[in-house]
A protein has these predicted regions:
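N-terminal binding-site loop/beta-alpha segment at the start of enzyme catalytic domains
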Residues: 1-96, 113, 153, 168, ...
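Alpha-helical scaffolding within the catalytic cores
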Residues: 17-25, 81-82, 116, 188-194, ...
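Acidic (Asp/Glu)-rich catalytic clusters
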Residues: 26-28, 78-93, 120-126, 195-199, ...
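Structured beta->alpha junctions
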Residues: 42, 69, 102-104, 213
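A structural motif
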Residues: 62, 125-128, 178
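A short, structured active-site edge motif that brings together acidic residues
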Residues: 91-106, 130-136, 208-211
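Beta/alpha (TIM)-barrel catalytic core signal, keyed to glycine-rich beta->alpha loops juxtaposed to Asp/Glu
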Residues: 104, 135-388
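CE4/NodB-like, metal-dependent polysaccharide N-deacetylase domain
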Residues: 112-133, 171-172
Length: 388
């Protein structure tokens, strides 16, 4: 079963799950976080059913709601929460674990607090449970932009600048506007720099990143967890309806993988349920996943995965592998969000630079030196290379 966004069907006859049966993972601060987060990423699609889908998710037992200002629907999610309260699905928003994200365009220190206030007002709450910086640099793109969109003002990760943003995020925690803080789309190099330079009570407790059976990110996840940072995976179902700018012929669909299909057949379960079970059970159930759907049966199924262990140890091993030639698993480093629309000029158009830590700068002065060297090199290249 491929979860297609166009298929919308809400059915009140489907019984909710008991939220207390959903597995939770402890954060470094001692709080518990539901591993299953209902996603609201829909920024390039019509929002006419997102309110109903989110309210239905709450009715069916979801208690972790994942939002972001970049999705352009915090107001819609806020109305869904109010609707859930009116309908009696929850007594108040305090029953929810709400994750929000600071958008790249609001990373200037003066913009962080106003961005949070906008989020709180849109959601209709005084506090959220988790606030993440969405990406580690302030590069932006326009909604619905094309694959080849580039922002000439984009820059690589500059640690000096990020620390200034992070300090403002920490102030939000001190002010009681957010309970816990975390990151999203960080790499090992950027996280090492952050952990080096912040106090113990300023450390992120959660990092959200792309993870699914064909992009398992095992080494990176182990690094984060060694530092006490819980990992949650977005694109958990391969996001078959992601924007066109993030769809390329090189991509593979997780639910078309023969191993996923074979295990689904063995269990008599859906392909989506197998993919999410991998996300819920891997690494001793220490992380989480983000998933969304617009049918009541799928919404319930996606949550039910977090209430039991669907996969046997043998089935889990077939997906994960064990680092041996005999059992490599199915990880194919199949990244679906390349992030090419965030590239800076010095990256020369190679989206891999976003993820391989080859252009991580400590200071603004260091970036200016790097930029000048790059520009000089390209000037010589243009002057000496045959142009045909």
């Amino acid at each position: 079963m491929t979860q297609k966004i166009e298929q919308v069907c809400f059915d009140n006859s489907i019984q909710p799950l008991d939220p207390s049966t959903v597995h939770q993972v402890p954060l470094a601060t001692g709080r518990m976080m539901p591993v299953a987060a209902f996603g609201t990423f829909h920024s390039d699609w019509a929002q006419n059913y997102m309110e109903e889908a989110t309210a239905e998710a709450i009715r069916l037992g979801w208690r972790h709601i994942d939002t972001a200002r970049a999705y352009e629907n915090e107001e819609v999610v806020g109305e869904a929460i109010r609707r859930a309260i009116r309908e009696g699905y929850i007594a108040s928003a305090d029953e929810l674990f709400i994750t929000g994200k600071l958008w790249n365009g609001h990373m200037a220190p003066k913009d962080v607090a106003p961005a949070m206030d906008t989020t709180l007002q849109a959601l209709g709450v005084d506090q959220i449970d988790m606030y993440l910086n969405h990406w580690p640099w302030p590069n932006v793109h326009t909604p619905g932009c094309a694959t080849d969109h580039r922002n000439p003002g984009a820059v690589p990760y500059i640690h000096e600048a990020f620390l200034e943003t992070w300090a403002e995020i920490c102030k939000l925690k001190q002010a009681g506007k957010v309970v816990d803080i975390g990151t999203s789309n960080h790499t090992q190099a950027t996280m090492k720099l952050l952990l080096r330079d912040v106090a113990q009570d300023e450390r992120p407790v959660y990092n959200q990143m792309e993870m699914h059976p064909l992009l398992q990110q095992t080494e990176l996840r182990r690094y984060f967890e060694s530092e006490g940072i819980v990992c949650g995976g977005y694109m958990a179902l391969g996001s078959p309806n992601r924007p066109g700018r993030d769809t390329f012929k090189e991509h593979r669909a997780d639910m078309m993988d023969p191993t996923i299909q074979a295990i689904a057949a063995e269990l008599g379960e859906s392909l989506a349920k197998v993919a999410l079970a991998w996300a819920a059970q891997r690494e001793n159930k220490s992380g989480g996943y983000v998933a969304m759907a617009t049918r009541s049966d799928w919404i319930a199924e996606n949550l039910r995965v977090a209430t039991d262990d669907l996969l046997s140890a043998e089935q889990l091993l077939r997906i994960c592998g064990d680092d041996t030639p005999q059992n490599p698993g199915i990880d194919a480093n199949n990244r679906l969000i390349w992030g090419q629309v965030f590239l800076w000029p010095e990256a020369d158009g190679d989206w891999r630079i976003l993820w391989d830590d080859s252009q991580v700068l400590e200071t603004r002065a260091g970036y200016q030196t790097f930029k000048a060297s790059w520009e000089a090199h390209h000037k010589v290249q243009l002057e000496t290379t045959f142009q045909g």
